A protein has these predicted regions:
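Glycine-rich flexible loops
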Residues: 1-191
């Protein structure tokens, strides 16, 4: 894959995530790595409307190589994950159900599809201010042994061997959270 198809794929997946409600408004960000180049969505642009020419290309130090926009405010989060884990795609969403769990402090159970169920819940990292190096380092460390984590009071970060895999995992987390929310509500209602 070359950079041009990579920026096209980022836009396609960004539009898909937006259409599924995983990145409402101007929230969320995604990136993909090709060799030593990272392509990331810009800051302040809706993922539902982002265009290829708005995608920012950077090196692994975070130096901008191409693109007229500022990179996502969560650039350091993406860089830390790439430094700590051999993945090619990262998706950060603010989807309703998963973020609801993150804000309530309630954990999302691991269901089939999350690999071995040696751990009963998805990992949640403690709250840190969005866009900070503190959050970036916590996420980088938290994803060393996981493919997806929940950010307390914030959202979800999913990784994958490619961007499509990361986006499908983020979507699966949201559906899992939705199912668990519905089940918990129904368990407390008498018919």
């Amino acid at each position: 894959m070359t950079i041009n198809p990579l920026t096209r794929e980022i836009c396609e997946i960004a539009h898909y995530l937006y259409s599924k409600g995983l990145t409402p408004g101007k929230s969320g960000n995604i990136s993909a790595r090709f060799q030593d180049t990272i392509a990331i969505t810009p800051s302040g642009v809706s993922l539902g409307h982002v265009t290829e020419d708005e995608i920012v290309l950077l090196n692994m130090r975070g130096d901008v190589l191409a693109g007229g926009n500022n990179p996502s405010s969560e650039l350091n989060l993406h860089l830390e994950v790439y430094k700590n884990k051999d993945v090619q795609g990262i998706v950060h969403t603010h989807s309703s159900y998963a973020t609801g769990f993150a804000m309530s402090g309630k954990k999302i159970e691991r269901l089939e599809g999350f690999g071995e169920r040696t751990k009963p819940f998805l990992k949640m990292v403690n709250y840190a201010q969005p866009g900070t190096m503190e959050l970036a380092q916590m996420v980088g460390e938290g994803l060393k042994e996981e493919d997806v984590i929940i950010l307390e009071n914030h959202g979800v970060v999913a990784t994958g061997e490619n961007l499509k895999e990361a986006s499908l995992l983020a979507e699966f987390v949201e559906e899992t959270a939705k199912i668990q929310f519905i089940a918990r509500v129904l368990n407390n209602i008498e018919f």
